[in-house]
Amino acid sequence: MEEINVSIRNIQHYLYCPHRWGLINIDCSWVENYFVTKGNIIHSRVHDPENSYISRNKRVITSLPVYHDEMGIYGVVDCIELTKSANGVQVSDLPGTYHISIVEYKPRKPRDKDFNEDDAIQVFAQKICTDSIFRCDSEGILYYSDVKKRIRLPFHEQYQDYLKRIRQLLTEIREYTMKGEVPPVRKSQKCSGCSFQDMCMPKVLVMKRHSNFRDMIEED
């Protein structure tokens, strides 16, 4: 299954909801709503090559394609910050050495915690790719636009835990892809804000009605 390359965007969709991921990738469906559109607007500000710039001792690069051949994952990093550091790494033909930070932009910060764990896993996947390309130990940062706050992620302290989780997700994604199966519905709080709700939940209701009807017949 390692021959199946998986995009980081696919990992993100699978984390949000495996069934929704299956509708997008197996059934090839896509529906946008307010939350999707808002996310696209926020990303459009950073996914623009003209937004790359230099500020004092920091070079900022946006929309950077990254990949990891061994793990078979790839994607685009919102923003890479290169800060001059004596303990950093060399980057291409740039003079000096740099500390590398990955910054992922998100629209809303969770109310009851510092960061969304699914967001952190997405950034960790970007880190794996970035570290492989630049041969570094990059820092992961989430920027939540609603509170205008940067959150540094605990990758150094929990590296093995995140690595194990990523490998587990890749195995599941590749298994469903090979079988051509859409994962079953798992109803959660995310359903109310999902753009696929009208496509997904009616199917569940119909299945329940059919099941109830069969039960009535069997009882008779």
Regions found by a protein language model. Give the residues of each.
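Metal-dependent nuclease catalytic regions and adjoining charged, substrate-binding loops involved
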Residues: 129-220
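Aromatic side chains
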Residues: 14-16, 105, 143-144, 196
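Mg2+/Mn2+-dependent nuclease catalytic core
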Residues: 58-170
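Structural motif
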Residues: 4-11, 116-118, 182-189
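Metal-dependent nuclease catalytic cores that hydrolyze phosphodiester bonds in DNA/RNA
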Residues: 1-102, 111, 210, 214-220
